Amino acid sequence: PSRCIHFHDVCHDCPYLWGGGSSRDLSRKIFRRKEKLYRGRHITFVSCSRWLGTEACRSALCVGQHVTSIPNPIDVAFFKPGDKDEARRRCGFPLDKKLLLFGSVKISDERKGFDYLVEACRILLEKYPDIKEKLAVVVMGKCSQELEDRLPLAVYSIGYVEDETRMVDIYNAVDVFVIPSLEDNLPNTIMEAMACGTPCVGFDTGGIPEMIDHDVDGYVARYKSAQDFAHGIYTLLYDVDHRAFSHEAREKVLSAYAPDVVAGRYIALYRNEIEKCGTCEKSKPS
């Protein structure tokens, strides 16, 4: 996590363990086990984002090893654009409002940044009070009903959604997907939303700026700036060619995260590693 850099040297006192761990906790034991396993071996580590790859390079476990990044794939034949009005009818959403979507498995997790979304919506209405009756937020995930009273806009709380077909409808029904996460790697939700042609607003953190091309298919807000996040929401809703951004979002996913693209990158990586092994074998004295 961003608050912990013990992995730069050796893991211990892990903040994810009960009580914050200890100097000789499970994280340290696993670290030492990996250290022994990796010693003397030439390993290529693959992260799913460049950000995570950079973090991995800072780990004592990866010293002298090769780290590269290849993203996770998404089924672009399943997550795809559809008719917005039909999707809204199936979801029970209004046809006469702009809709934002915020979703997380556990919305109350402070790392998901719900407080920043609340503040961004407040700033938005303070600056543009006339949009209050024309804008609503779809909130998806556990604890969504508990948090809906905090938003200053109309809220459609839909709880945790397991049905992927319904998920596609939800992404197609909304105008903008908002992800105010303070820590994230390569969020599947951004990938899914963009695959459905829904532009996204997110903070400049983790792998998010790798996914969203600022002012091309979405908006990357300054980290922890609710004001810039609010500006991003308004920009995508009212100031840009939504159809063009939607098209670019879909194209980004097709070019970067489609299964054949990701598979091709893994094939190229394996071929490169095999060639290196062959070169090493030939260079050994007989």
Predicted segments, located by residue:
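Conserved donor-binding/catalytic core segment of Leloir-type glycosyltransferases
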Residues: 93-112, 118-122
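Nucleotide-activated donor-binding/catalytic signature segment of Leloir-type glycosyltransferases, i.e.
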Residues: 128-134, 141-165
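Short alpha-helical donor nucleotide-sugar binding micro-motif in glycosyltransferases
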Residues: 169-174
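A short, well-ordered alpha-helix in the C-terminal region of glycosyltransferases
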Residues: 228, 241-256, 265-268
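Carbohydrate-associated surface elements
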Residues: 51, 73
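Aromatic "clamp/platform" in nucleotide-sugar-dependent glycosyltransferases that forms part
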Residues: 182
